[in-house]
């Protein structure tokens, strides 16, 4: 899968629509061998300003010599902006690779009777994978 194919897949999922429940994301990360359990995470919550706080914290830690990875939403220009390693957005090639791996898991999930994950759930699973495959998870602080 190349970057354009990855973007076509992401866009095909649709941006809007809330489907309450954890079944989709739980099933998806299970098929991906729970990448979220392999990373140390600072999880930022709240109503407003989460992306700014995550970005500030990521840059502060990177500037102090820490290895960091950051996942934020939404993006400004490209989806790659949502996933950064040491302050640098992941490459188009890495984005395509984690999209392909996640899509395979989504296809299996649907084949097994699961409900279509939302675009946000798919991108979140992709972020977990990118932080495992691209970075050194045991040496990084992940901010999301």
Residue ranges, per PLM feature:
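Short functional linear segments
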Residues: 1-46, 53-66, 71, 110-114
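Electropositive phosphate-/nucleotide-binding environments in soluble metabolic enzymes
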Residues: 4, 19-22, 89-92, 96, ...
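N-terminal phosphate/diphosphate-binding loop that engages ATP/GTP or pyrophosphate donors
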Residues: 56-104
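ATP-dependent adenylate-handling ligase core
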Residues: 101-120
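Short acidic active-site motifs
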Residues: 127
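Feature captures the FAD/FMN-dependent oxidoreductase FAD-binding
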Residues: 130
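Single conserved hydrophobic/aromatic residue that forms the stacking wall/gate
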Residues: 133-144
């Amino acid at each position: 899968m190349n970057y354009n194919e990855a973007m076509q897949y992401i866009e095909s999922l649709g941006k809007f629509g809330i489907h309450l429940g954890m079944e989709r994301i739980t099933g998806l990360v299970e098929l991906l061998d729970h990448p979220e359990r392999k990373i140390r995470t600072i999880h930022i919550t709240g109503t407003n300003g989460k992306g700014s706080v995550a970005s500030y914290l990521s840059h502060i830690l990177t500037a102090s010599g820490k290895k960091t990875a950051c996942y934020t939403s939404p993006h400004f220009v490209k989806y790659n902006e949502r996933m950064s390693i040491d302050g640098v957005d992941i490459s188009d090639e890495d984005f395509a690779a984690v999209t392909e791996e996640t899509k395979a898991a989504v296809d299996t999930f649907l084949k097994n009777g699961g409900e279509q994950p939302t675009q946000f759930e798919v991108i979140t699973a992709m972020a977990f994978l990118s932080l495992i495959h691209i970075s050194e998870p045991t040496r990084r602080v992940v901010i999301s």
